[in-house]
């Protein structure tokens, strides 16, 4: 994170993170001062308008000062179609809600989330229900860790 970008980030308040997917969007919440992220909810993304209404309810309830959207890229850092869709999603969030929105590299978060859930004996249907919000938690925690490492 560049110094100018770091200076423009809020330092207090609530952050919401999103693991964007075609079918589901995982959401996590965290406190900027504490630098701790927690899974929150998984939203269905089958009906885009209903999904945006659900996100609007989360905005009203949690009053975030920052949004973090996972940016999926190939292992070598090259972009693909879901990268572009995630960027569009982030731009829509910022335009619709007027809240600073940043992108965070999400390489391997779903794999890490699945491994953590396997270790906790969460498998099958239950894992599918929470996998995306755990991935969002890892995205947000990565953002916090990187931010704190540069301060």
Curated annotation (Swiss-Prot):
The keyword Hydrolase applies. Disulfide bonds: none annotated. Belongs to the YqgF nuclease family. HAMAP family: Nuclease_YqgF. Signal peptide: none annotated. It is found in: Cytoplasm. PANTHER family: POLYNUCLEOTIDYL TRANSFERASE, RIBONUCLEASE H-LIKE SUPERFAMILY PROTEIN. This is Putative pre-16S rRNA nuclease. NCBIfam families: RNAse_H_YqgF. CDD domains: YqgF. One of its GO terms (biological process) is rRNA 5'-end processing. Pfam families: RuvX (PF03652). The keyword Nuclease applies. InterPro entries: RNaseH-like_sf, YqgF, YqgF/RNaseH-like_dom, YqgF/RNaseH-like_dom_sf. Its EC number is 3.1.-.-. GO terms for molecular function: nuclease activity. It comes from Nitrosospira multiformis (strain ATCC 25196 / NCIMB 11849 / C 71). GO terms for cellular component: cytosol. Its main location: cytoplasm. Could be a nuclease involved in processing of the 5'-end of pre-16S rRNA. Keywords: Cytoplasm, Hydrolase, Nuclease, Ribosome biogenesis. Gene3D superfamilies: YqgF/RNase H-like domain (3.30.420.140).
């Amino acid at each position: 994170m560049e110094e100018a970008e770091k200076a423009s980030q809020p330092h207090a308040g609530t952050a919401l993170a999103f693991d964007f997917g075609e079918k589901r969007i995982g959401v996590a919440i965290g406190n900027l001062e504490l630098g701790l992220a927690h899974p929150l909810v998984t939203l269905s993304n089958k009906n885009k308008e209903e999904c945006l209404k659900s996100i609007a309810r989360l905005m009203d309830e949690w009053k975030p000062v920052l949004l973090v959207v996972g940016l999926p890229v190939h292992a070598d850092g090259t972009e693909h179609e879901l990268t572009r869709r995630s960027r569009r999603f982030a731009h829509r969030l910022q335009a619709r809600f007027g809240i600073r929105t940043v992108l965070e590299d999400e390489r391997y978060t779903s794999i890490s989330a699945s491994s953590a859930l396997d270790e906790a004996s969460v498998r099958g249907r239950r894992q599918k229900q929470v996998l995306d919000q755990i991935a969002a938690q890892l995205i947000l925690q990565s953002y916090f860790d990187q931010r704190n490492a540069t301060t």
